[in-house]
Amino acid sequence: MNKFKNIAVYGGGSFGTSLASLVARNCNNVTLFLRDEIILKEILYKKTNAQYLGDIELPTNLQATTNLSVIKDFELIIIAVPSYAFDDSIKLLKTYGISKEHTILVATKGLADNPTELFSDRLNTLLPDNPIGFLSGPNLAKELAKNLPASASIASLDIDIANKIAYNFSSKTFSTNTTIDIVTLQIAGALKNIFAIKSGIDLAREQGANSRATLIVGALKEITTLSKVLGGMQKNSDILLEAGVLGDLVLTCYSLGSRNTKFGYEFEISRDKKKFLCEYKELVEGREALKLVLDLIKKYNLHMPIVAEVASLILI
């Protein structure tokens, strides 16, 4: 199978930089697109991104630029921006010449808003003719950048596209699986951060290891519930057991390196919870996703008790 000859990664944060670093080990022509000129110079001349990844050394062949006019020259474009920036990012890239010839890989996790829908549905409107893929897995950014062992699921309605993308990522330290179940992979990516908040709360309450394991079971059930009504989990899909669902869920819920687990823990130990919520400045993806997931629960009249409990605690 042929690899993509050149790859662009749009998003110069910790995850975008780590993904660019990962694929640069498999592909000679990888460019990270970012906005910050200071970080750009650091990546080009020092091969580090200290603001997001400390002193981790990036591959020598990794290139970087702030010049979006050349992004149209890349075959595969990886989107690695926060969920709130997804729409604006796609619209911006369209003005720089993205055409139906470009394959888009979405590494952003969450849901689109106004209206609430999957990123795949939003892309049906914004980029209806492009080959689209989704990537998700237990991928802490600093560990990826260090080339430590990890894995991911890659989903596309066209399994050949998923396999081609996987071929660019797979290595001795990074394993992949592919699926056509784009719905479940996206739902898991949005919900796992909500479950991680619950995990942090339970940790602060000293609920014990049994409780946290039970949370994983309940989380998988709620992922299945929402996925099925949106068209996922068809044809005996086994995606639940793969890196992009179970793997990512376990990592996010069990690691205090997860912003969402950390948020849940700090929320629970805070004395003044309203003040804590008002003053908490760090981005918490689960907090943002929660409001959108509640829209879907209401729309489809679903029973998702873990999501409901987290909402009752932090949406005050």
Swiss-Prot record:
This is Glycerol-3-phosphate dehydrogenase [NAD(P)+]. Signal peptide: none annotated. Belongs to the NAD-dependent glycerol-3-phosphate dehydrogenase family. It comes from the Bacteria. It holds the Pfam family NAD_Gly3P_dh_C. Sn-glycerol 3-phosphate binds at K109, G137, K192, D248, S258, R259, N260. One of its GO terms (molecular function) is NAD binding. It is an enzyme of class 1 (oxidoreductase). Pathway: Membrane lipid metabolism; glycerophospholipid metabolism. Keywords: Cytoplasm, Lipid biosynthesis, Lipid metabolism, NAD, NADP, Nucleotide-binding, Oxidoreductase, Phospholipid biosynthesis, Phospholipid metabolism. It comes from Rickettsia prowazekii (strain Madrid E). Its EC number is 1.1.1.94. Catalyzes the reduction of the glycolytic intermediate dihydroxyacetone phosphate (DHAP) to sn-glycerol 3-phosphate (G3P), the key precursor for phospholipid synthesis. GO terms for biological process: carbohydrate metabolic process; glycerol-3-phosphate biosynthetic process; glycerol-3-phosphate catabolic process; glycerophospholipid metabolic process; phospholipid biosynthetic process. PROSITE patterns: NAD_G3PDH. SUPFAM superfamilies: 6-phosphogluconate dehydrogenase C-terminal domain-like, NAD(P)-binding Rossmann-fold domains. The keyword NAD applies. One of its GO terms (cellular component) is cytosol. HAMAP family: NAD_Glyc3P_dehydrog. InterPro entries: 6-PGluconate_DH-like_C_sf (IPR008927), 6PGD_dom2 (IPR013328), G3P_DH_NAD-dep (IPR006168), G3P_DH_NAD-dep_C (IPR006109), G3P_DH_NAD-dep_N (IPR011128), NAD(P)-bd_dom_sf (IPR036291). It catalyses: sn-glycerol 3-phosphate + NAD(+) = dihydroxyacetone phosphate + NADH + H(+); sn-glycerol 3-phosphate + NADP(+) = dihydroxyacetone phosphate + NADPH + H(+). The active site is at K192 (proton acceptor). NADPH binds at S14, F15, R35, K109, A141, R259, L283, E285. It is found in: Cytoplasm.
